[in-house]
Amino acid sequence: MKKLILGACMFMGAIGFSQDNGYFFGGLESNSQWLLDDEDFGFTAPEDQFRSNNYLQLNYTLGKFTAGVQYEAYLPTVLLGYSPTWENQNGIGTYYLNFKNETLDITGGYFYEQFGSGLILRTWEDRQLGINNALKGLRVKFTPTADLDITGVYGQIRNGFDVSEGVMQGVDANLDLSSLMKVDAIDLKLGASYVGRYQSNGSNDSIPSNVNAYGGRLDFVANNFYGGVEAITKDPDVIVNEGTVSSPQLFDGTALQVNLGYAQKGLGINSTFRRLENFSFYADRYAEGNVYNEQIVNYVPGLTKQHDYLLSNIYVYSAQPRLLFNDTEKRAGEVGAQVDVYYSFDKESTLGKLGTKIAGNFSYWAGLEATYNDAEQTYDAKFIGDGDRYFRDLNIEVKNRWSSKWSSIATFQDVIIDKGVA
């Protein structure tokens, strides 16, 4: 398939000017393509060859108030590969009004929010991926002291130019323990989150109307070491696959993520362990597993190296948090880890004079080892076990700067991926 890009980002970024103590700012982004026939791939261009996604954002700030609106047009039709939800649509996508002072930050309308690492809640916009799951409702942030902040949200997740059937609510709190206890040797922060979804079950009382998730986290920095742990549990809910309830049983979900790292001049080490069991979360239970990530509540990225070059990025891993329990496929989630090591040679050394930098990465992700009881529709998963391997990547990168005009990058990569899953 061949594409002629007519205007990838006509212009994107901030434009602004002030007037009578107020301030306007915003931006325009236009991404267009013209699809052509490609005989080599047997691709015939659709009737709507010209496609365009366009975004116009305008904001105005006056004193402690800020208001904004975003107009979107997917005309004459949306770019190929985006959700049909946007097909031939245009109109006001988002709008908001915000008030902010030293202790209060209140937003009504559409807003974006993240609790912790995003494992329990993250709403965001990514135009390149066609994702916009902004919350429409009310957000209140309260910062009574420098050591404590509390955020409350209530609303519905955006779905195209509409909103989700499910109603979301949540509370997040962060406490600076080191400051509170006047401890200087270590930076210690404690966080707790709650996110709930209400969605009518119609006349089916076996489906819960309310599904809640609860999480806690602890982060630290001590000298050159840093780390954190976040654990979340989600109430039992039905399993949905392709818009249909696939099991009469209810299953709870859990998530655990642990980070540990070390940093000093010339050396950095970062490691992450994560275990997800039945931990997908959507504003509409029937949206679970949709390929466009519409109405998704939390953020569960694949924790692997983001390579610089296209050839390496052919092998992309997507996280597998879902529980699938049917005749053709059974899996309960994923478990794995990633380690990054960065090293820069001292500038006075031979390699340091060449600007030599070495980066190494290893990641391994597998399914949870579990036993399944088809008759009773139950399963039992081990904490780690020896589940099927989904993805493994070992890579080393060496960068040199030989002169002001010449530099080189040498990369070794050994990757295994199960494309049937990842």
Stretch-by-stretch model annotation:
Residues 30-36, 62-64, 71-77, 101-103, ...:
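Transmembrane beta-strands of outer-membrane beta-barrel pores
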Residues 1-25:
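Bacterial Sec-dependent N-terminal signal peptides
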Residues 29, 47, 51, 183, ...:
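Exposed, low-structure sequence patches enriched in small/polar residues
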Residues 131-214, 219-222:
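Hydrophobic, small-residue-rich alpha-helical packing segments that form membrane-like cores
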Residues 19-45:
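Short glycine/proline- and aromatic-enriched beta-strand/turn motifs that initiate or cap beta-hairpins
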Residues 59-61, 65-157, 260-285:
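Outer membrane beta-barrel
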Residues 18-24, 60-67, 99-103, 107, ...:
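Short loop/turn motifs that connect adjacent beta-strands in outer-membrane beta-barrel proteins
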Residues 57-59, 68, 95-98, 139-141, ...:
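Outer-membrane beta-barrel architecture
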